[in-house]
């Protein structure tokens, strides 16, 4: 599949504080690409760099194979985005808002296209109502319609379910999936809520303190035959090094002086335990974790040092 966006060693700091550090990832055509991280992890900063709203201190961004800095205005024609809550004219109708923002795109956009995007986002029949009468979920959907009017290749959504009620959240999930499956859009969607990403994304990136922790297909990260095995050991700074070159190294997800986290089939736990004991590890406890939430928490532990791409 074609690569829509690629970043290489992207870094950004504010007043000597690293917001994003050496971030490299790629988004493929047709992906619903989940961008997952705790609040303050660097998600919004990265998205702003992708849109040219702020500039990286170092690193490169490529859109459809072309470096962003070389053709910024042209490349932005291929991207639609909502960063935080979209600003709209509440005293005007949804249709009038759509017309105004379509005009700002500097493209000739026919009325038929405006009708089409309203249909896509589920606002057909409400376009004549004033925006101030819309629910928050409807405003978000109108924002997406505005982002879609110029038929972009990529749609960037920053925390699109924030502030929505349960029905609004469900509607937004359904819309994101529909835009990908039925309308062929590539979507980059960020969230600090793991279960939101799990339900819509095909591929995902976990970011923590501005650094990539793991990237891969959601189905691979959620492999049903594998589980997380957390081994609590007596303090030993050498055990992780002993894993190098062994069959267990490829399964290691995270390591500290007092704990190791592996991702593997549970049937191998006895064999792993035997190897650890034979190599001097004082095992205090072995715990298994099955949920993606536990996986996320283990990956974003402050002491995680191992970065991995699936």
Language model features: what each stretch is:
Residues 1, 225:
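Exposed loop/turn and edge beta-strand positions of beta-sandwich/beta-sheet ligand-binding modules
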Residues 227-299:
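Short, charged/small-residue-rich alpha-helical element at the C-terminal edge
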Residues 106, 184, 248-249, 301:
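Residue-level recognition of short, structured coil/turn motifs
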Residues 303-310:
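Short, charged, intrinsically disordered terminal tails
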Residues 2-7, 12-189, 194-208, 214:
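ABC transporter nucleotide-binding domains
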Residues 67, 192, 216, 235, ...:
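Short beta->alpha linker loops
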Residues 219-223:
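Short acidic-hydrophobic catalytic motif
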